[in-house]
Amino acid sequence: MSQTPSLAQLQPADAFLRRHLGPDPAEQQAMLAFLGVSTRAELIVQTVPPAIRLNRPLELPAALDEQAALARLRGYAGLNQRWTSLIGMGYYGTVTPSVILRNVLENPGWYTAYTPYQPEIAQGRLEALLNFQQLTIDLTGLDLASASLLDEATAAAEAMALARRVAKARSNRFFVDAHCHPQTVSVLRTRAEAFGFELVVDEPDNLAAHAVFGALLQYPDSRGEIRDLRPLIEALHGQQALACVASDLLALLLLTPPGELGADVVLGSAQRFGVPMGYGGPHAAFFATREGYKRAMPGRIIGVSRDARGNPALRMALQTREQHIRREKANSNICTAQVLLANIASLYAVYHGPQELKRIAQRVQRLTALLAAGLKSKGLRRLNRHFFDTLTYEVGERQAAILERARAARVNLRVVDDRRLALSLDETCDAATLATLFEIFLGAGHGLDVAHLDGGAVADGIPAVLQRTSAYLQHPVFNAHHSETEMLRYLRQLEGKDLALNQAMIPLGSCTMKLNASSEMIPITWPEFAELHPFVPREQAEGYRRMIDELEAWLRAITGFDAICMQPNSGAQGEYAGLLAIRRYHQSRGDSQRDICLIPASAHGTNPASAIMASMRVVIVECDPRGNVDLDDLRLKAAEAGDRLSCLMITYPSTHGVYEEGIGEICEVVHRHGGQVYMDGANLNAQVGLARPADIGADVSHMNLHKTFCIPHGGGGPGMGPIGVKRHLAPFVANHPVIRVEGPNPLNDAVSATPWGSASILPISWMYIAMMGPQLADASEVAILSANYLANRLDGAFPVLYRGRNERVAHECILDLRPLKAQTGITEEDVAKRLMDYGFHAPTMSFPVPGTLMVEPTESESKAELDRFVEAMLSIRAEIGKVESGAWPAEDNPLKRAPHTLADVTGIWQRPYEIAEAVTPSEHARAFKYWPAVNRVDNVYGDRNLFCACVPLDDYRE
């Protein structure tokens, strides 16, 4: 009788781990054998310097399977209380149309794509972003808009920085409307202090008393008041200062656009266009300005260019403004923005169209007017004369009773102070909401009837002089997709133009495009997480608190740091927040003169840009011929800095894809000269479970949760960049003016709009760590295995530029194409575009070394996919050989003409290579052909003929 397996034996082993890792055990053994080693442990010993090795398991709970992790997180979600939150302050209830929820937010074809640096395979989301810009331009009344910033508060800080760059006024003072949202004022204080600006927060009526280079006005303001800004804007222009206006997209459907009032910059949050509040984010900020300020504008701008056939094609325009090119001279350190959320907001506008959007705005405004009329009839004193959706009341001694009735009804109001209350209505409110509010403010037996009020004459709250008369959203895209069938097909059409992780490996170096597992994504749309206002009382967010506390504890265990600050909502924001903590630390010790930041020449562009934002002076440290930090140059630069040395920013493993043997000495040199070590966490995926930043010598580091910890890139955001700090820096990280966070100095101002940044995507990283547990080290090991496998397989055709100990690379490698360019004229761009014909997204081009490709396979790609990439690259090398031999002309070959489109093969073919060679160069391409939507995009034409709005594309055909 055969013995059947026991129940214990039938339990799934490493249930999630084996789903997350691409190569199975047999494939891993084959890869190890190719590298000449027997085990992963042997490879790690050869690769990771022994001085930094963490020779023990991570102190994390045992891994849960997917169902157990979801059940546990569901329990946390159930602890969050879903009250009706009318707190406002830039966050409002909204309805995400189901067709967008299911086909965009929950669709890996949208959320797993990368920032559209390769526009030929990103035309779908580029079109959605262009729609976002058109939406912003139309509603703000300005000439030019960007494709999103991180949140309203940081957008306001970017507006202040732009004003200083372009204003002719000589003042160093920036004025802030006292009735801006408090979180915005706090972020402005942080940025102004670092820049050395004087910030004046005062009543708008007092603006004339101040000489300024710019001002931020809120329209409608945080109290709900709507005032005519023209006199204030004229006064600002009279002293050659810029007028910046924070506004609300829904209100602008009914209000005169700020651009028509004379504003120079308009910004705000697009959250209420279909994006859940999510306890603070992620949300896309909009930002618009005048055409003349285009080169001073922060963030991504999508422009219309043309492709090699002369057809319209979209691309990211004016990239020379940005950190990845201009580094310390960049306008901003913005890298990751909020593309996925900007796309949701733009698609919300596409689906509803101008008439339905106006109806939604009118309904919100009508509800507010009825509430105002009812409370006025009962003698309540309203403090704002005009309004769109927000009312503020002086309630005096009645406040306690009102709040008690509100709690009984599970309604959150905004407590302004001990005598004033405010509330903001939104798309989710209805007549029943008003009935509840009448009872809350007036008690039982108030005698008001909503239907009766609605039948009478009620003032609408918007002054006649500020009622909108100009048209908006007239472009066909906003008037063609209003049935669900049409919208569904439009979304599919856009998605089909793009290449995302659900189709192929995206081997972008320094980007960690790993699996974003479905089980990790499921919780973000649970209403218990999605619907919470960021400023609800702590007890209503108990589930969030437990989840965040647990995630912070796990991140401490992984990194070795003593404290975590969750506020930064991108990696670049994390850099900025960490550098500010260092700056505050030095100031607390009387070392305010310490302002020099040492940065290796190989660093990410965000590093010098963030250092400049933190009021530091950047000094570059050279690298040696092997790509390591030149220790002699570091010692020299540190000694020269002396008591002005603030810190060193260093990425580990380095951006050259190696574990530097001297990292311990590097940290020691900086500490010996009184500096702090900031470790850029971009490459943390090669450290987890193998080494810890704090043990290596870092004092502070950010963690890209959208890289190492599985938050998807969303086509260019969202991201999260929490920072870990050692104990001595913990008091100096960001706090928040509305919800104080335990630990940091309560007087510290904020770096982002909400206390825990983009809190609603934190469940993704929680799920990943919960399901991996101590086996997170396996992910790091397989990432290193895959990178070395690729490096060694490709090295004969494309030399690997840098290697570390025992000729190993870390989790990524740099392929040197410069010799081929010199011999054949084929560039790294030609190879990148040709990979599209094989069905691949290109590796990172020309970073950190011009003329190279940086490849990072991650742990999630199977050996079959790695081999497919190798075969594509080797095939491309053979094609280059045909150019080299003269078989193909130097300027007319599949590489120079790549990528190839349907338009190429359906027209007259007059090229020295076959159609099959062009479009089906591999077996995979023959079986699963991905067609780029456009031919190679003309970047120069796009910048010289900048156009960043939706115009009928026929207008761009010559």
Curated annotation (Swiss-Prot):
Any one cellular-component term (Gene Ontology): glycine cleavage complex
EC number(s) reported in the record: 1.4.4.2
Keywords: Oxidoreductase, Pyridoxal phosphate
Keyword Secreted (UniProt): no
Cofactor requirement: pyridoxal 5'-phosphate
InterPro entries in the cross-refs: GcvP (IPR003437), GDC-P_C (IPR049316), GDC-P_N (IPR049315), GDC_P (IPR020581), PyrdxlP-dep_Trfase (IPR015424), PyrdxlP-dep_Trfase_major (IPR015421), PyrdxlP-dep_Trfase_small (IPR015422)
Membrane spanning stretches: none
Keyword flag Ribonucleoprotein: no
GO MF annotations, alphabetized: glycine binding; glycine dehydrogenase (decarboxylating) activity; pyridoxal phosphate binding
GO terms under biological process: glycine decarboxylation via glycine cleavage system
Catalysed reactions, as listed in the record: N(6)-[(R)-lipoyl]-L-lysyl-[glycine-cleavage complex H protein] + glycine + H(+) = N(6)-[(R)-S(8)-aminomethyldihydrolipoyl]-L-lysyl-[glycine-cleavage complex H protein] + CO2
SUPFAM superfamilies: PLP-dependent transferases (SSF53383)
Pfam families xrefs: GcvP2_C (PF21478), GDC-P (PF02347)
Residues with N6-(pyridoxal phosphate)lysine modification: 707
Family: Belongs to the GcvP family.
Physiological role: The glycine cleavage system catalyzes the degradation of glycine. The P protein binds the alpha-amino group of glycine through its pyridoxal phosphate cofactor; CO(2) is released and the remaining methylamine moiety is then transferred to the lipoamide cofactor of the H protein.
Subunit composition and interactions: The glycine cleavage system is composed of four proteins: P, T, L and H.
Protein name: Glycine dehydrogenase (decarboxylating) 2
